[in-house]
Amino acid sequence: MDFVLNTIQWLREVPRNFKGEVATVVFDDSADILVYCCVLYILLVFMVPEHIMKNREPFNLRLPFVVWNIGLCLFSICGAYSCVKNMTALYWERGFYRTTCFFDSSVAYDGEFAFWVFYFILSKIPEMIDTVFLVFQKKPVIFLHWYHHLTVAIFCWHAGHALIPSGLWFATMNYCVHSIMYFYYFMCACGMRKVIRPIAPFITMMQLLQMVAGTLIVLYTAYHSYLSESGCEVDRTSIRLGLVMYGSYFFLFAVLFGKLYLKKQVKPSGTASAYAMSKKRNGEKMA
């Protein structure tokens, strides 16, 4: 029992003792790591299915997939709890404008909040392992899936380098959505797709709302940076990247939502029916 309590106490102390210099070293001096990871990811998406897995049977990765998803779910829940708690306090103390446009190093550079934002950014690289499971199980990798993983890793790394205050909102929203999304994937991996399936439209809607909120926040910072006399300290390159990223995400998720849940289901027959059932079994649902 003492071991458990000591472990819990240690896990609480680690985020509180986090120093922002670690993030500075990673994001300022190690940008080449991001490049290597992105190149390997592109090779994974476009080369492995055709040249390595083409004539091979799919791997049975169910157990690793279960462990992977519950791990990301728990990580996201912890991050969501901390970020929501700290972001709420910061908002009530400073208001939306100062929270979004001005970086408070006393809150977001050291300590618990900074710890979870730092690991949120870093997590975008290992999250690419989602695609590894798809590729080696010979499941389809749709454009939205790999485009989202690739661009969000690049944007988040730049945000960590530029220390954009609006990124605190982005991290908080993403943690909340991912805590539910990865729980859904965990349940599906455990063979309970039929039980959990009714919440799938809700998850896609949450993702859409996240894109809307993200776009509005970027537009808000763009207005204060380019037009308002009050100004905004968010890096302008980050603003432009954010507009492209969130705008494209919203469009792609909206198309996916319409394709999955709004179009009338026409019962196919013959080969078309077999193809549709194959796609369903392969899990071509969400990014």
From Swiss-Prot:
Any one biological process term the GO annotation gives: fatty acid elongation, saturated fatty acid
Catalytic activity: a very-long-chain acyl-CoA + malonyl-CoA + H(+) = a very-long-chain 3-oxoacyl-CoA + CO2 + CoA
Functional note: Involved in the synthesis of fatty acids. Elongates C16:0 and C18:0 fatty acids to C26:0, with C24:0 being the main product.
Keyword Lyase: no
Keyword Transport applies: no
EC number(s) given by UniProt: 2.3.1.199
Swiss-Prot/TrEMBL keywords: Fatty acid biosynthesis, Fatty acid metabolism, Lipid biosynthesis, Lipid metabolism, Membrane, Transferase, Transmembrane, Transmembrane helix
Residue ranges annotated as motif HxxHH motif: 145-149
Protein family: Belongs to the ELO family.
PANTHER family linked: ELONGATION OF VERY LONG CHAIN FATTY ACIDS PROTEIN 6, FATTY ACID ACYL TRANSFERASE-RELATED
Residues at the catalytic site: 148 (nucleophile)
Protein name listed in UniProt: Very long chain fatty acid elongase 4
Gene it is expressed from: ELO4A
Topology in the lipid bilayer: Multi-pass membrane protein
Compartment(s) where it occurs, according to its Swiss-Prot or TrEMBL record: Membrane
Disulfide bonds: none
A Pfam family annotated for this UniProt entry: ELO
